[in-house]
Amino acid sequence: MKTKLYLITNDFPFGKGENSFILPELSFLVKDFEVTIISTSLSEDRTADVDAEIKVIHYDRKEKLLRKLLDCASYLGHKACYKEMLDIFRSGGNVFGKLFESVLFYEEAKRFERYLRKNRIIDDNNSCVVYSYWYTFYCLTMTEYFKNKENIKLITRAHRYDLYDEGSRFGRQPFKKYMNNRMDYIVFIAEHGRQYFYQKYGRERKKEQYQLFRLGVEKPDPIVTGRHSNKFLMASCSLAISRKRIELIIEGLSQLSNERIRWVHFGDGPELNSIKQYADKLLGNKHNIEYEWMGYVDSNEIIKFYQKSEVDLFITTSASEGCPVSLQEAMSCGIPVIGTAVAEIPYMIEGNGILLDENPTGKDVAEAISYIYDLKTEERMQMRKRSLELWDERFNLDKNADAFLNFLRRVSTEG
């Protein structure tokens, strides 16, 4: 008989944000577990099909205002909240903002716990694994609901917005210290995140309770038809938002005079129009540079483009990242890469491209592009080979998912 596993998600199988991450993992989980998905999505639009054997529960977040206010008031009566408030006041900065965020976090956790209890969603009389895909308020619910239940293993993944203080509106992650001491395992998708968390919260626990299991991407089919022009083809893929610093790519290209380059950017976002205008201003009169805005494109289509067009270089100049999937996808296609030394990117660029400083200048970007451009054929092929090797070692989805499944098997049998 399979062990029950409850997977708590932000959206999946509703909305679009998690499909590409969770669908591949599910195909491994169902091999050994009886899976129930508890989605907390606000969307009613179901966008992913799952096996008939997987039960899907769509959490109804609706609650009366009075009940919400009572939950907020109960914050003052919880022992953990006194420690939380003390930590907030010691942290300085926008204390009232941090306190406000903490109270809302607590209220959401209480509301979710009440829903689980009322509807008897989780069978806590038998051994099971409760697996949260994000390290957020569900985890506070889990630590309260299953307090002192040794037959239930509590596991969460930790990504970026749910891990780093900078991902929080007021520069502090609510209840992390409290939840840390009560989760059985925290699974990080990036080594940088694991080190960050351990230094900040983890000294009281064994390192084994902080596991690294990267997500990864699938290996594309080997379809390469050759380049479409004699120009060096460079690609980038990101949302058009300030922390992605697409303007640095533009500034770098503007300083190149002899290199014949075609740059394509995949992705849209709120700042795309202003970025386009900036590109027109700096690159519009440069006859050696072509650029094209592809807008939002499904990741499968992006990979097909990489394969068919024989992309020479992938570049990201982001100021902040987790473990960027866009970079993993480029590596899986054997593309040399340029990236900034933030978060997990230093673990992704080792002999397969150029690692820029955390805050590079346009000149730094130009020099890195020029270096890759000038590589001899043999050197470029060596970089391509190294990108594939690193992808296979660290970001191969099948290998990573299988390793994570083995971990869950072991955890589910622990006493």
Pin down the residues of each PLM region:
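A charged, aromatic-enriched C-terminal amphipathic alpha-helix characteristic of glycosyltransferases
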Residues: 301, 360, 364, 377-409
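Nucleotide-activated donor-binding/catalytic signature segment of Leloir-type glycosyltransferases, i.e.
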Residues: 276-305
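Aromatic "clamp/platform" in nucleotide-sugar-dependent glycosyltransferases that forms part
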Residues: 319
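Short hydrophobic beta-strand element within catalytic cores of glycosyltransferases
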Residues: 313, 332-339
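Conserved donor-binding/catalytic core segment of Leloir-type glycosyltransferases
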Residues: 187, 217, 221, 225-244, ...
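Donor nucleotide-sugar binding/catalytic pocket of nucleotide-sugar-dependent glycosyltransferases
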Residues: 55, 156, 177-222
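Conserved acidic donor-binding segment of nucleotide-sugar-dependent glycosyltransferases
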Residues: 351-362, 371-377
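N-terminal subdomain of nucleotide-sugar transferases
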Residues: 1-64
